[in-house]
């Protein structure tokens, strides 16, 4: 059995690929503008499916392939590029066929569940916190004033490598760290766009960042604070003015009765979500999961011009139509309704 450190693809996420008709192509036929996807085949008594490697795994494999390397090491396996097989690190006799495909759609058919549907913790607004209370990003900033951009990138890279080792993801973590270190001495625009692009990838990073922020886990302040700060400040950067979005947004969730009641009790109050929030402009996709749909608008008295950053153009999944709401953005809880037909709860929020 393979070591289970962190599951990369949920069942729902990979299900889309099971029905795809894919074609392996030779290197000489590939356009540099075409999307390349690497698959491995699972075969057992109940299933025979081609499943995709993770986003970062695919980039690592593709680089090795283009460099004519015979074998590439990933966190969970080896990929032999001469024999086109995926080899279990703990049991080399356990092998799966591998293939390379070009020109597939870049998007998942719906929204990635762990990105768009994980319930956010409803907490008091930032203005309600006492001076001795500490929130993750603000506490990191308080302890790390005066760092240069290069020092920020170095700290972010070093911390992600440390977290990756703890999660049994050292190779994926090193890829992320190397990408960040390549940004040293680059323009702010190039840095910010790449930070957002890295965040959109299906990897351990966005899950870990948001779990840390939701729990306000200050033990990870050094390891994740710099990356969180970089991503947080993209929202108010001139780089993203053209990507600002002020329209209606949607996010699904599966909430228990107590959590729904907490929103009901908060009607008319200002609250916040401590984590970054992935929302979609597409209501139909957002409401396919869970018993609750958040309908998010921009308050007329909002301090900011936009609800969030439309990052779909920087994402490997543009059809998600993702708009990212920054961490700790305050909002009013306006109302709660329950749809008489579907039974789904509709929670209306307006961003301050």
Where are these regions (language model features)?
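Internal glycine-rich, Lys/Arg-flanked active-site/core loops of soluble domains
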Residues: 154-312
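Tight coil/turn sites that cap or link beta-strands
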Residues: 246, 328-330
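Residue-level recognition of beta-strand microenvironments
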Residues: 330, 336-338
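Short solvent-exposed strand/turn elements
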Residues: 341-352
